[in-house]
Regions:
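Conserved phosphate-binding elements of NTP-dependent enzyme cores
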Residues: 1-297
């Protein structure tokens, strides 16, 4: 029960609920920058001709009651103007007189909670471009070289390596006519998505299906000696997604998980240090420990 959770010294949640722990600020607090990003005369929707200044190089938080204009300011005015000026996007921003300071940035990255994909074929590994590295790694295994397997052999979207009965889905749809369709595990591959020959190729004792069933944290241990793979896995862990399975279907992820996947993808890319990150309610639904991880990035 709640009282036991709060009093338990071994419970992370209890530590936060009791006040023994909390989301910490960075011990080395950054000094405000001389440069600022300034929105002039924002007047769209509920905004009433306001000027807003954001210090460059710091974490800025926009908060307020529902309907106060937070989303209008950040998403409709700032994000759309930045997308237009930095990326030539054809977006019409909300009414305002101008934005000063965008010259301090060379790109704008907007990270929201919209789904990363409706298809069950999309997963964390494919979204952050990790699956490409894994397929290449499996194609370099000794058995793959003997058999002439290419990275495409380890894609469940292509004929050759996938199970042809379920077409790489791992599930088979049963038409129930007047009832909703039912999906059952493929009898041929037992849900593994690949054919027997492909699953005979192993990396450190694991085949490709077993790797996709691993959590991100477990995979980090397996690929310790492969820097390019490990870097992506560690970035996923840094945003608090170490518990997700590499092959977990995208349509089973929450909005917060989708948002952190997007953030991980952006952080794993080469950056110039001049990116403007716009996060829409990044802590919604997160445990305090995950909020701390987000703050520590």
């Amino acid at each position: 029960n709640l009282s036991k959770c709060v009093s338990s010294s071994s419970s992370i949640t209890g530590s936060f609920l009791s006040g023994r722990d909390g989301v910490r600020k960075d011990a080395k607090e950054k000094k405000p920058s001389d440069a600022s990003l300034v929105v002039r005369a924002a007047r769209a929707n509920n905004l009433r001709n306001i000027d807003v200044s954001f210090p460059v190089g710091l974490l800025n938080v926009v908060c307020g009651i529902s309907g106060s204009g937070k989303s209008t300011l950040v998403n409709e005015i700032l994000a759309k103007t930045a997308a237009h000026r930095l990326h030539r996007a054809k977006q019409v921003p909300g009414a305002h007189s101008g934005i000063e300071g965008l010259d301090h940035f060379d790109q704008a990255v907007r990270v929201d909670q919209s789904p990363i994909g409706k298809s069950p074929r999309s997963n964390p590994a494919t979204f952050v471009k990790l699956f490409d590295l894994l397929r290449k790694l499996f194609s370099q295994c000794s058995l793959s070289r003997v058999r002439g397997y290419t990275p495409g052999r380890f894609s469940f979207n292509l004929a050759g390596g996938r199970c042809e009965r379920c077409k790489g889905d791992g599930m088979v749809k049963l038409d129930m006519q007047f009832l909703a369709d039912v999906f059952v595990e493929c009898e041929s591959c037992k849900g593994k998505r690949y054919n027997r020959e492909t699953l005979e190729v192993r990396f450190r004792g694991k085949n490709i299906a077993e790797v996709l069933e691993m959590s991100i944290s477990e995979a980090s241990e397996l690929f310790q000696k492969h820097p390019s793979v490990l870097a992506k896995l560690q970035t996923l862990e840094a945003v608090g997604l170490g518990y997700l399975r590499l092959g977990q279907a995208a349509n089973t992820l929450s909005g917060g998980e989708a948002q952190r996947l997007k953030l991980s993808l952006e952080l794993s890319r080469k950056q110039s240090g001049r990116a403007l990150y716009l996060l829409d309610e990044p802590t919604t639904g997160l445990h305090w420990l995950d909020v701390q991880r987000l703050m520590d990035l």
